[in-house]
From Swiss-Prot:
Domain HTH CENPB-type, first and last residues per copy: 67-139
Domain DDE-1: from-to ranges: 168-385
DNA-binding region: 28-48, 100-132
Top-rank lineage group of the source organism: Eukaryota
Disulfide bonds: none
Gene that encodes the chain: Tigd2
Family annotation (PANTHER family): TIGGER TRANSPOSABLE ELEMENT-DERIVED PROTEIN 2, TRANSPOSON
GO CC annotations on file: nucleus
Name of the protein described by the UniProt record: Tigger transposable element-derived protein 2
A Gene Ontology molecular function term of the record: DNA binding
Species annotation: Mus musculus
Amino acid sequence: MLGKRKRVVLTIKDKLDIIKKLEEGNSFKKLSVLYGIGESTVRDIKKNKERIINYANSSDPTSGVSKRKSMKSSTYEELDRVMIEWFNQQKTDGIPVSGTICAKQARFFFDALGMEGDFNASSGWLTRFKQRHGIPKAAGKGTKLKGDETAASEFCGNFQEFVERENLLPEQIYGADQTGLFWKCLPTRTLAFDTDQSTCEYRTSRERIIIMCCANATGSHKLNLCVVGKAKRPRAFKGTDLSNLPVTYFSQKSAWIEPSVLKQWFEKCFVPQVQKHLKSKGLREKAVLLLDFPAAHPAEELLSSDDGRIIVKYLPPNVTSLIQPMSQGVLTTVKRYYRAGLIQKYMDEGNDPKTFWKNLTVLDAIYEASRAWNQIRSNTITRAWKKLFPGNEENPSVSIDEGAILAANLATVLQNTEDCEHVNIENIEQWFDSRSSGSNCQVLADIVGAADRAKVTEQKPSRKTRKAELNPEKHISHKAALEWTENLLDYLEQQDDMLLSDKLVLRRLRTIIRRKQRIQNKSHL
């Protein structure tokens, strides 16, 4: 007589493996024998495939699915979703999170969401919350979530062994990371901005987008910037073919990239672009992508190419500031280029601050952010990988700080602008480095108003010139030229065979026309 089969309790990771094997064509019987479970259990796993995957997506990818066995959800699912998003954001920013802080924040969200019920943010609730999302016990005890040097060192060693074992070259190793960009954040203090405090607080949730930078360790392959906004199709996109944008655009409501968006980007953008690049280099179409820890990311098992040759590896918790390549100055430099571009765009157009701010659209921001990412040099990227690959830099003795050079160049331009002579590099660095968590945007001091006055003084047309313009043989107004340029830009956005450089030229012409129109309006006052 056969003995009773021992009861086997599968982890979430085991169930994900079974789902993957089923998709590969393995039979129910084969898997039941392999895992020591009944065929009916395998069928149940297939039936609950979507629920299992969704649960795995909301768990800590480094430990949540490997240890967790049940999928019991929270009584207050909306609160649970908001809390894990908040927790991830605090962890990314290196902000201390204790059990008391978690409890208070949960209570705040419960009330803010207008939820009903007898909710008590007790220690029991906190324990269950951490278990549901695979959050390590050490997290939430009040220690600052900063770089864990021991974990970073251990990961570096293991990763280098993995690279050698898989025979991967730096060309085949990629890194990606995301950051929030307050795209309407302008320098504020004195002059025009100081007269109305409401204009100083330019940063609102509607004016924030997420950008994700991705490149390989050599810096030779930078994927198009990934941009995530709240609106599926912003008004500024009217008439624009999204496939013609210089970035890959997604929409969602959350503050950080959701699992579904990341999975879609990985499958539709990352994998095919990497395969194409490696093929052009005559290399095996095999690669690995390093991603940060956030628990909202899909499990590693869910992110791989169909042939399993392009995979994802997650960094351990709390090592982003130490070894995440894109966090070693790359994202910061992109933001600096973006902000410097805003100032240059403002000075080129010659509008007053409020008009410039009002006219600035998310489409403008996307082009400016794309330009900023394109300006990042390959040696800046290779230098960012030096902790994972100490010998990866071509010329390690030559270190170029793009951010410092950018600040110095902008300071030189402004110091040669009337009434901005006192602006120094420290002022610019302060604005460049202002964090999204601050109460207001940092300042450059008197830049915008002085720039207006300098341009009006320099370019204000004479009375004779204005008189000659009244009766020209054929006069085209700035307004008409601007309308035609806008229409032509809309046309180009709808075409799938236009070069980005062509569109950038027209956008530059539009900036010049706007500036001329502004100067003319001022001259008639």
